[in-house]
Amino acid sequence: MAKNCLTLGELDRERIADIDRRLGLKLDGSPLAATTANRIRIVARASVQSAIDAGAVPADVWPQRSKTRARRKVARTKRSVDVRAFPSPAAMAEAIDAIVTQQPGSKTYRVMTAVAYYAGLRPSEVVMLRVRSTELPAQGWGRLDVTEADISFDEPGEPKTGPRSVPIPPVLVAMLREWIRQNDLTSPDRLLFRTRNDTMPSGSNWARAWHRALESVGQRPIRIYDCRHAAATTWLRAGMPLAETARRLGHSVETLVSTYVGALDDEEHVGNQRVDSILG
């Protein structure tokens, strides 16, 4: 320990900057996933802060976070989606079915897109679903347990906002039951979506297949991630309570309202009607 550790007196800005850089690397020098590196840096910075509070090292030795990056993060949190850009539920269903072509992997991309829309999952969560993640009854609604996400190229981790259980409608239940049967997915640990070479489906190929399908049915291009936004918009306009919508998406209610404010335009009229019914 004495040979390989710095003393508190050696913790100056230059050395801390080098430590901060190295905390973002694996032992072989390749970069860690951003979320993993951030988690490690938080622990390291807390340790240094304890030394600062005790007066053992000068204050503010840790590299300051980029203000530009911080501003970008604030802007992202305040950004709301344009709910008018999303196709109707019927148009979404038509576009999802149109994904299937003669192209390799098109059937996989169809089911993946259906999961993104009908369950409101992030693409990173879709690709990490396993057989054991599914509850698929012969009739009625089912459920997906969202416990993993592809947080980097191929490194699994927890979903962005933690594990959650998401109800799924019968149309998606039937689709997943047929998918599991067709592909003989019997192992509980088996990932639902893999290529013929048993690798992770390509995000770029998925996006291209989706854009071709949208174009073929006369719809404007939207991102795969926008399927999640379209799901939230559909749920809110159907009258799903804010808290339940937020839970299914893995959001706080505050984030939900700020992101999908355009889908809540009808709430004022509905609210007025309910108050009128009470006031007489």
PLM regions with names:
Residues 1-31:
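Basic/aromatic-enriched alpha-helical hairpins
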Residues 31-34, 38-42, 56-123, 127, ...:
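Basic, Lys/Arg- and aromatic-enriched nucleic-acid-binding interface segment
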Residues 49-61, 116-143, 243:
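Short, charged phosphate-coordinating catalytic segments
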Residues 64-72, 128-181, 254:
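Conserved tyrosine-mediated DNA breakage-rejoining catalytic core shared by Y-recombinases
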Residues 88-93, 99-100, 148-152, 169-220:
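Active-site/catalytic core of tyrosine-dependent DNA strand-transfer enzymes
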Residues 114, 118-125, 205, 209-214, ...:
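C-terminal catalytic core of tyrosine-transesterase DNA break-rejoin enzymes
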Residues 133-141, 221, 240-261:
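Short, polar N-cap/turn motifs at the start of nucleic acid-interacting alpha helices
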Residues 150, 249-274:
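Catalytic-site neighborhood detector that most strongly recognizes the C-terminal catalytic loop/helix
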